[in-house]
């Protein structure tokens, strides 16, 4: 598989994003800090977004550079966590007692952010 150099160069930064998201799990419809973090990344990369869907949801939009088209593609990631204690002991373990990203949403959200940056 060929990985673009620009993506490869962002590996450590992306790992940091995933670790940050992992450390701030929040249950569904209450992901205020998570939503804030995602919006900060979208703003950092000048990606247009709208917020407030289902309380904390975000919709981002990336337009192509080859003219106006009515074609589109949808990508999505959940970013809610599970109401369960985290028993891991790494630096980026959950800061929120009784909540954990145990199903990969921290990784999925990181991959979606990367996709938006590189589309």
Predicted regions and their residues:
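Acidic/His- and Gly-rich active-site-bordering loop/insert found
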Residues: 2-101, 110
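Conserved small/polar residues in nucleotide/adenosyl-binding loops
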Residues: 117-119
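Active-site signature of alpha/beta-hydrolase-fold catalytic machinery across serine-
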Residues: 114
């Amino acid at each position: 598989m060929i990985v673009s150099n620009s993506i490869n160069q962002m590996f450590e930064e992306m790992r940091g994003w995933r670790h940050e998201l992992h450390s701030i799990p929040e249950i569904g419809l209450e992901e205020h800090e998570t939503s804030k973090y995602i919006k900060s990344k979208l703003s950092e990369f000048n990606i247009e977004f709208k917020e407030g869907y289902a309380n904390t949801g975000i919709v981002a939009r990336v337009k192509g550079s080859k003219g106006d088209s009515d074609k589109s593609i949808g990508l999505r990631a959940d970013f809610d966590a599970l109401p369960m204690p985290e028993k891991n002991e790494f630096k980026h373990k959950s800061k929120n007692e009784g909540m954990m990203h145990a199903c990969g949403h921290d990784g999925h959200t990181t991959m979606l952010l990367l996709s938006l940056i590189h589309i």
